[in-house]
């Protein structure tokens, strides 16, 4: 039996005995409780430790979000799962991410740019999430091949994410916003406080030369598209050249599924129930026998 409940029941008995000796007034009798409404706690494991006596001070410490330290790993896993669910629901155009097999704190991704200065660019990246997420700093986003851009470090390939998220606020900022920001920088160029001063100066002073270097950067990134991932992981995003034997069948299945979905949605729209009789503008004017199935 849990020592915490033994201690509590003993203290209750002592208080009741003292109250009987001291009190001289009429006793108040509470109405009897029905046994059916009595709640019981689940069984306590044999090696369980009372919550009033932590094993060590470190276990009684709470994180900044008020979560007990022993729940930290579970809370982190739940937070990351919720974040990935939000990413899927947002359906960011041209952005695809996949959490790592080895660590949920590392996500692999790729951005497809369809128009603008960086048109036809395919940029692979990795997102690094702090181990104290969501209470730490903002996640980091590093491109596999440094892109020629004012906000991308020309050596490390890291994007200046802190520009958009100076202070990461839990329950307000989300990873999908970081991904959207990474996509937006290729369509809206910002040159203030750049990580790549050369790119910023060329964009301001010589746009044609800037465009030329961007084209070269896009070609460089695309030339490394089929390289093996820098981080060995079963869930890393890998591209391979088009193979008709493998890819034609998959392509046909995807197109067939898309066509089937479009036909179903179109059929539902045409044959849906209507409460207006053809040729009439009055609501609820459809004949009753037409509603029978």
Curated annotation (Swiss-Prot):
Residue ranges, annotated region (Disordered): 1-45, 256-293
Compositionally skewed regions (Polar residues) per UniProt: 1-11, 24-38
Localization annotation: Cytoplasm; Cell membrane
PROSITE patterns with a match to the protein in the record: UBC_2
Biological processes, Gene Ontology terms: apoptotic process; early endosome to late endosome transport; endosome organization; endosome to lysosome transport; lysosome organization; protein transport
Residue ranges, compositional bias (Basic and acidic residues): 14-23, 256-266
Record SUPFAM superfamilies: UBC-like
Chain ranges of the UBC core domain: 75-223
Membrane topology value: Peripheral membrane protein
GO cellular component term of the entry, any: FHF complex
InterPro entries referenced in this protein's UniProt entry, alphabetically: Ub_conjugating_enzyme, UBQ-conjugat_E2_core, UBQ-conjugating_enzyme/RWD
Keywords, sorted A to Z: Apoptosis, Cell membrane, Cytoplasm, Membrane, Protein transport, Transport
One Pfam assignment: UQ_con
Similarity field: Belongs to the ubiquitin-conjugating enzyme family. FTS subfamily.
Role of this protein: May function to promote vesicle trafficking and/or fusion. May also regulate apoptosis.
Record protein name field: AKT-interacting protein homolog A
Annotated organism of origin: Xenopus laevis
Lineage: Eukaryota, Metazoa, Chordata, Craniata, Vertebrata
Gene name for this UniProt entry: aktip-a
